[in-house]
Regions:
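N-terminal helix-rich structural modules
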Residues: 1-99
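Active-site-proximal, well-structured secondary-structure segments within enzyme catalytic domains
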Residues: 34, 38, 67-70, 77, ...
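Short, charged, low-complexity loops and linkers
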Residues: 19-26, 122-129, 147-163
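Acidic, low-complexity proline/glycine-rich segments
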Residues: 24-41, 120-144, 177, 238
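Second-shell loop/turn segments in exported
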Residues: 47, 128-132, 153-158, 189-200, ...
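Residues forming anionic-ligand binding surfaces in small-molecule and nucleic-acid pockets
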Residues: 44-47, 141-153, 241-258
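A conserved hydrophobic secondary-structure block that centers on an alpha-helix together
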Residues: 41, 50-64, 152-187
Length: 329
């Protein structure tokens, strides 16, 4: 909706004339750096939203933008629904072998929420998926979960995104070329530090060259440990990597992430982050339970500057749930 509103607003004739006049007639030498940056950003956004195109091309730009907005939303909705719709139900304690108590408790809680009493449910949400792949001794179950996670929206159902991806690629290319760019990458990078796709590829290739020797060494260490534990004929597969990498880390560094969990309880982490922000920037956070929130898990904090003046409201939304995109917000 915001993308559509921006396109309409920036392409309107009155706004086009005002912004263009302000940009061309303003003596930029008399502007502060902040004013100059603001003017440049507004004008650049105005141009990138098709305001300098002919009327016919503007109509095409609006059509492409609307289609891109709709398809992008559909892509995200499909991924969210596919993620939230998946359940790996474990029926016996034997299937829990290797899992830490925290992961078992979380799986039992998820099962309870889904009405599957006496079972354990693993989902594709990261707080459920990641611990299972790290700690589960059940290789075949790890494979099942890995395949489900890495083939999301690729199945023959209503959530398949393959056609949408193809449409997005074609529409983005058409939009970029309409604005005079060679491709969509050039359009995006015009406002980025890299500026050109060649610079991006150079950075990636430099990183690849620098990291490859160490990465290969680490993979060989993990493979060697796996064969030591499972036999010389053992073939390391993608669903094995996290599991044996965790075992190698424990062997080399005696580091158990589960043992660290009590030190990173959510309230402690929030206090630490808020305290750091106060120390660095002088801003403070005060929870206000009177501010309406969109879900009981959400907390609202008023943010104040060092002089006590109000700056903003911060909403925190840390926990996964159905209907929510992955990650802490």
């Amino acid at each position: 909706v915001d993308d559509r509103r921006n396109v309409v607003m920036l392409c309107s004739e009155d706004n086009r004339n005002r912004i263009k006049a302000a940009y061309e007639l303003t003596d930029k030498n008399k502007l502060t750096p902040e004013q100059s940056k603001l003017l440049e950003d507004i004008y650049t956004g105005f141009v990138r939203n098709g305001a300098n195109l002919s009327e016919e091309d503007k109509a095409t730009f609006r059509k492409l933008s609307m289609e891109l907005s709709s398809l992008t939303l559909k892509f995200s909705q499909n991924h969210l629904k596919e993620t939230n719709g998946y359940e790996l139900v474990l029926h016996t304690e034997d299937e829990l072998a290797g899992l830490p108590e925290s992961a078992i408790e979380a799986a039992a809680h998820t099962a309870h929420e889904k009405g599957k009493e006496g079972c354990w449910v693993i989902t594709l949400q990261d707080p459920s998926y990641v611990p299972f792949m790290k700690y589960s001794d059940k290789r075949e179950v790890r494979k099942t979960l890995y395949m489900a996670y890495n083939t999301q929206c690729c199945h023959d159902n209503e959530f398949n995104n393959l056609k949408i991806v193809e449409q997005l690629v074609n529409l983005r290319m058409e939009l970029a070329q309409l604005l005079g760019f060679k491709n969509y990458a050039e359009y995006v990078l015009k406002k980025r530090m890299a500026e050109h796709s060649e610079n991006v590829y150079k950075l990636l290739n430099d990183l690849l060259e620098a990291y490859t020797p160490t990465a290969r060494q680490e993979v060989e260490e993990i493979r060697a440990l796996a064969r030591e534990l499972e036999g010389e004929d053992f073939e390391l597969m993608p669903w094995d990597f996290s599991y044996y990498a965790e075992k190698l880390k424990n062997r080399k560094f005696s580091l158990d992430e589960e043992a660290l969990r009590p030190y990173f309880e959510l309230s402690r982490v929030k206090a630490g982050v808020f305290g750091l922000a106060t120390r660095l920037y002088g801003i403070t956070f005060k929870e206000n339970k009177e501010i309406p929130v969109y879900h009981p898990d959400v907390q609202a904090y008023e943010v104040f500057d060092r002089d006590g003046s109000f700056l903003a409201v911060l909403y925190t939304d840390f926990h996964p749930r159905e209907g929510k995109r992955s990650g802490a917000w």
